[in-house]
């Protein structure tokens, strides 16, 4: 439990001459920054789902607590489907010869942009059911980035440093879990009696954050060239 999987051979074969890469280089690499930025936007949507989705259904749309109970399950069902689909599709694309830039970077970032655009449409539909559907689909698409970022980081990070790099990555992107609920609450409070308008403004902000995060992901996620850049440095690192 907790050890590197079967794709990592150097620990099992007794190879210990792994050259480390400085954390300043790893943490300022464009793919690391892209992973943090993209997942920051995805976690923004996730944290709002945990904190404000049910209140939106009950107080914003007028559903009963009983109905809210089963409606609140929908984002997690759809999100689980996206996670499984992304993992399967990424493996298929790589097996067919696509670079990890496309099979991981683009595949993880593009759904963030699509999801953000969907969220921007919520204020423009009148049906409560359509609002919920757009929110479920738009927020659920962000699940794609969680699947691809850890393996992308693993592509260019030396084996002995992967745990630390992935832990730092997680600590940074989850900061949005503190910011997003506060922003939504502030917007709703300032809306006064027009609570639904406050929710709509909050979801517009959510959509914009996801779009920016997705665009940054498309711009910065180049794990295959990141590895080549590190290997071209004088202090070469050894990769699994």
PLM feature spans:
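A membrane-interface helix-boundary motif in multi-pass transporters
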Residues: 64, 103-106, 186-210
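Multi-pass alpha-helical transporter architecture, strongest
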Residues: 118-123, 205-236, 240
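Interfacial helix-cap and linker-helix signal at transmembrane-aqueous boundaries
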Residues: 57-58, 89-90, 94, 185-194
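A late C-terminal transmembrane helix in Major Facilitator Superfamily
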Residues: 83, 156-192
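Extracytoplasmic gate region of multi-pass secondary transporters
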Residues: 29-86, 146, 150, 177-185
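C-terminal transmembrane helical hairpin of 12-TM major facilitator-type secondary transporters
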Residues: 101-149
């Amino acid at each position: 439990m907790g050890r590197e999987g079967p794709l990592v051979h150097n620990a099992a074969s007794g190879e210990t001459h792994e050259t480390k890469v400085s954390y300043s280089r790893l943490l300022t690499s464009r793919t690391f920054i892209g992973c943090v930025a993209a997942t920051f936007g995805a976690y923004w949507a996730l944290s709002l789902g945990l904190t404000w989705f049910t209140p939106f259904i009950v107080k914003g749309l007028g559903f009963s607590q009983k109905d809210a109970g089963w409606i609140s399950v929908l984002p997690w069902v759809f999100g689980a489907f996206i996670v499984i689909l992304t993992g399967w599709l990424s493996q298929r694309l790589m097996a067919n010869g696509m670079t990890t830039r496309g099979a991981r970077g683009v595949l993880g970032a593009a759904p963030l942009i699509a999801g953000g655009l969907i969220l921007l449409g919520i204020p423009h539909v009148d049906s409560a059911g359509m609002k919920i559907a757009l929110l479920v689909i738009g927020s659920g698409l962000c699940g794609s980035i969680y699947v691809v970022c850890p393996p992308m980081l693993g592509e260019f990070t030396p084996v002995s440093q992967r745990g630390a790099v992935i832990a730092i990555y997680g600590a940074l992107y989850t900061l949005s879990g503190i910011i997003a609920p506060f922003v939504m609450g502030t917007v709703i409070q300032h809306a006064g009696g027009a609570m639904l308008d406050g929710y709509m403004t909050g979801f517009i902000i959510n959509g914009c954050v996801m779009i920016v995060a997705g665009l940054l992901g498309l711009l910065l996620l180049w794990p295959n060239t990141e590895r080549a850049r590190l290997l071209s440095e004088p202090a070469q690192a050894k990769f699994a």
